[in-house]
């Protein structure tokens, strides 16, 4: 696996852990789901925080680049989990965000 593929997979796993960690409390608070879902939510958010420490860049650069990946993964979640069709504006926004992420993440290293 190339370094770029490893970093992309790490970004995607980080985003998924954050989304699950936030979605489960949303289900409890908005959809009346059982409170025990807060336990896996907390574990997922702890996993999210730990995964952030595995990224090779400085924290601020990691967070900035991660934002683009988060947007793309959140839109995939919207389509797959929530069953909402993506608009062309959703796709355009994700492409722009991923472009910004690529500029940050793929910059020449000094």
From Swiss-Prot:
Intracellular or extracellular location(s): Cell inner membrane
Keyword Heme (UniProt): no
Keyword field: Cell inner membrane, Cell membrane, Membrane, Transmembrane, Transmembrane helix
Keyword Cell membrane recorded: yes
Listed transmembrane segments: 9-29, 34-54, 66-86, 88-108
Record's bilayer topology term: Multi-pass membrane protein
UniProt GO cellular component terms: plasma membrane
Top-level taxon: Bacteria
Main location: membrane
Family: Belongs to the UPF0060 family.
Protein name: UPF0060 membrane protein Bcen2424_1283
């Amino acid at each position: 696996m190339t370094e770029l593929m490893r970093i992309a997979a790490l970004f995607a796993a980080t985003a998924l852990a954050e989304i699950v960690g936030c979605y489960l409390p949303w289900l409890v608070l908005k959809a009346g789901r059982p409170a025990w879902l807060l336990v896996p939510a907390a574990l997922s958010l702890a996993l999210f925080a730990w995964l952030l420490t595995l990224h090779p860049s400085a924290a601020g650069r990691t967070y900035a680049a991660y934002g683009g990946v988060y947007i793309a993964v959140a839109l995939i979640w919207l389509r797959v989990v929530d069953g909402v069709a993506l608009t062309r504006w959703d796709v355009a926004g994700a492409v722009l965000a991923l472009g910004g992420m690529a500029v940050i993440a793929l910059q020449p290293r000094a």
